[in-house]
Amino acid sequence: MLVLFSCASVKEPQGGPLDSDPPKLKSTTPAILTNLNQGQKITLSFNEFIKEESLKNAIELFPTVNQKIDFEYYGKEVIITLPSNLDDDKTYVISLNSNLSDEQNVKLNDNIIIPISLSNSINQAAIKGKIFGLYSKPSILLWKGIIDKSELPSRKPDYIISSNDKFSFGFLAYDKYTVLAVDLYNPKLSLEKNKLSFFSENFIELTKDNTPDLNFFFNAEEVEVELDSLNVTEDIEQFANIVGNINGNYILPVVVELRNEDNSFKTELSFDGKFKIDNVNSGTYQLFAYQDRNNNKILNTGNLQDDSNSEKFYVYPDSLILRANWELEIEDWEIN
């Protein structure tokens, strides 16, 4: 039996080793979160004391509704009150985001997702994916339905999924969705003032037999660098090179790019599907290939001003280690 209590103040335990683990959700009351009622209270029980101030911006409900979630704080327990305007036939998710922390200010690494429903079932559709390029704190925005780009700035997303280098999200309805990646998403700014990355298609469709695997890419801010001609010449033996061939369904021109946080090396795929990149600095790299629709040698990720989405890109499944005076061969990389 779960006993709730209140007191004048909640104090963190004294002494002991420094806590570096984020809080964990132990249980909910009720344990089964279907057939709920409008305005029902749900108790969240954690394994340690939660910092009360962190709750203010940590509890979200998706799909978004106009009414806020109210909560009461009891140290290791938080009682939330559901809005009174939920749809009977929808699955909602309570998302505890990375603002949530314990009394030692240790924040969540990943969102805690709690599916709930006023009906007797929970939706089962899901998406997953990875983020590539240079970014700080990306989020995935989902709108249910096929939404025209011109309407996105004026429409609140139905779901906001916090991410790092990868993401997954479930309990969605089987339907079509418009999807967008945003770095350092700030809902107080107009959407076009955020850093955006579109998917390669206008929409995704979730079915029982299809869990889309979505890739997004964020480019670095453009910075022009002037090369000092006195320092360009280096011993060729200090470099590595990479050769390979690509098979699959693609449309030329295709740019093959080898990149890490410090360097980027590019070449075009030849008509016979072969590529070679010379004079590569030693290091660990990711290998990309993308269909360069506008021939600018940049992986364009779309914008709100026209109908273009992200250029379709592919990522070699393993990271590559290149060493000086050494050639790495990539055989039969399959892309589709």
Description of each model-found segment:
Residues 1-7:
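Sec-dependent bacterial lipoprotein signal peptides
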Residues 7-180, 193-199, 257-271:
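Acidic, low-complexity Ser/Thr/Gly/Pro-rich repeat segments typical of extracellular/periplasmic
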Residues 110-111, 185-224, 293-330:
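Structured interaction patches on ligand/partner-binding surfaces of diverse proteins
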Residues 120-134, 222-250:
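A short, Gly/Thr-enriched small/hydrophobic beta-strand-prone motif that recurs across taxa
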Residues 163-186, 272-294:
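Short Pro-Gly-centered beta-turn/loop motif in secreted/extracellular proteins
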Residues 232-234, 247, 265-278:
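Short, contiguous acidic/charged loop-to-helix segments that flank catalytic cores in large enzymes
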Residues 241, 326-336:
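Primarily interfacial, aromatic-capped hydrophobic alpha-helices that serve as membrane anchors
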Residues 252-255:
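Calcium-regulated, polybasic anionic-phospholipid
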